[in-house]
Amino acid sequence: DGAIDIVCAAQQDDGYLDTYYIINGKNHIFTNLKDHHELYCMGHLIEGAVAYYEATGKDKLLKAAARFADYAAAHFGAEEGKCKGYPGHEIAEMALVRLYDVTGEARYLELSKFFIDERGKRPYYFDKEHPEEVKRGHEDDLRYAYNQAHMPVREQDEAVGHSVRAVYLYSGMADIARMTGDESLYAACEKLWDSITK
C-alpha cells in the first residue's frame, strides 16, 4: 500500500502517469511511441492495478490506472483531431480489455480495439514519428516487423519480430475477438497461433 501511495502521488491532475516525461518534459508526451514505452508502462500499470484490486478489493491503484487510461483514450482514436498512433511495445491492448472487464467502461475496450485496428496501416504511423529515417531512405531501420506493425493485424499470418511484444498483441487480439465477435480477428489469431505452435 505504501508503494501504491508513492505511485499515485506522482500522477498528474490530468491523469497522466509516466515519471520519465513528468520529470523531463510533458511537451514530449506520446511523441515517440515506437521507442519509448509510455503505453507499455500504462499497460503494466493497468495489469498490476487489476490484479491488486482482484486480490485485495482495494481500488486506489485501479482508479489511478483508469485515470491514465482515460488520458490515453482522450488522446488516441479514430476521431478527427486524435492521434492515430499505437504502442511500439504492446501490452496496452490486453490490459485495456482487463480494465474494461473490471470497470465495465466501454471506452477501454474501444481504445484496445483502436490500437489493434490501427497497427500496420499505411502510411505507417512510425514514419510520421521518424521522418528523418524515411527521408534518408532508412525505413528498414524502423523495423516494423519487430513491432508487428509491418501490415494490418488481420493480414498477418506469420509470427514475426520480438516474441514478447507479439504474444502481448496476439493476446489482446484474441480478447477483442472474444469480446466483440470479430470473426476476421479470430481467424487472424488462429493463423498466428498455428505459426507459433507448428
Indicate residue ranges for each PLM-predicted region:
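Glycan-recognition and catalytic cores of secretory/periplasmic carbohydrate-active enzymes
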Residues: D1-K198
